[in-house]
Swiss-Prot record:
Metal-binding keyword on record: yes
Record has Glycoprotein as a keyword: no
Entry protein name: Enterotoxin type H
Mutagenesis / variant outcome for changing residue 232 to A: About 5000-fold reduction in host MHC class II binding
Assembly: Interacts with host MHC class II molecules composed of alpha/HLA-DRA and beta/HLA-DRB1 chains. Interacts with host TCR alpha-chain TRAV27.
Record-level GO cellular component terms: extracellular region
GO molecular function: metal ion binding; MHC class II protein binding; T cell receptor binding; toxin activity
Disulfide bonds: 106-116
Cofactor note: Binds 1 zinc ion per subunit. The zinc ion is necessary for interaction with host MHC class II molecules.
UniProt signal peptide: 1-24
Source organism of the structure: Staphylococcus aureus
Subcellular location: Secreted
Cofactor(s) the protein requires to work: Zn(2+)
Length: 241
């Protein structure tokens, strides 16, 4: 078993050992963000909402799926989608939710406190027989660092879940949302086996409030986990920008 693990890690290291081509000048700088934006980004990516195997038959405003008493501490949970079709897709289905949640400007459903979340929803029945390990290649100023690993047991996983997991690692290890940390720019790229790839500029936040930061996930973009090749992360320090 140990030998198999060593072979897996060696293969990942070989697979991910190509050169980074991301350009720092094309990315947003952390110095552009307010203290509030950095604090909210830290909170959103370090403390995700996670719930499995819950069901709702209630839709509000056509696009919001309502889970009574299923939020943290028994709050009502409002899951917001970009379209009514997405809300209908998950109505009356057992679902898993993994995402960044917020309270400010979350519309109340009842007398309970309401907790909101954009997307982050997958069907509970669609699980892998064996956990999938995805390698994340990290460069700082073009110098390759230790490969990070994220895991999922889902056949179809939201881009939000993967993004949160890798940003949590980067937050812990490189302090990306600390104002005084040396990292000033960054790009996360999800490299697929299919023609299309996906990327996030770490400091391209769409506002300083949590409900603004999280809105990029309302499309509930979902990837087949078997189609994900690996993740590339390019970080840049102030001295290199």
């Amino acid at each position: 078993m140990i030998n198999k693990i060593k072979i897996l890690f060696s293969f990942l290291a070989l697979l991910l050992s190509f050169t980074s081509y991301a350009k720092a000048e094309d990315l947003h700088d952390k110095s552009e963000l307010t203290d509030l934006a950095l604090a909210n980004a830290y909170g959103q990516y370090n403390h995700p909402f996670i719930k499995e195997n819950i069901k709702s038959d209630e839709i509000s405003g056509e696009k919001d799926l309502i889970f009574r008493n299923q939020g943290d501490s028994g709050n009502d949970l409002r899951v917001k989608f970009a379209t009514a079709d997405l809300a209908q897709k998950f109505k009356n289905k057992n679902v898993d939710i993994y995402g960044a949640s917020f309270y400010y400007k979350c519309e109340k459903i009842s007398e309970n406190i309401s907790e909101c979340l954009y997307g982050g929803t997958t069907l509970n029945s669609e699980k892998l027989a064996q956990e999938r390990v995805i390698g994340a290649n990290v460069w700082v100023d073009g110098i390759q660092k230790e490969t990070e690993l994220i895991r999922t047991n889902k056949k179809n996983v939201t881009l939000q879940e993967l993004d949160i997991k890798i940003r949590k690692i980067l937050s812990d290890k490189y302090k990306i949302y600390y104002k005084d940390s040396e990292i000033s720019k960054g790009l996360i790229e999800f490299d697929m086996k299919t023609p299309r790839d996906y990327s996030f500029d770490i400091y391209d936040l769409k506002g300083e409030n949590d409900y603004e930061i999280d809105k990029i996930y309302e499309d509930n973009k979902t990837l087949k986990s078997d189609d994900i090749s690996h993740i590339d992360v390019n970080l840049y320090t102030k001295k290199k920008v």
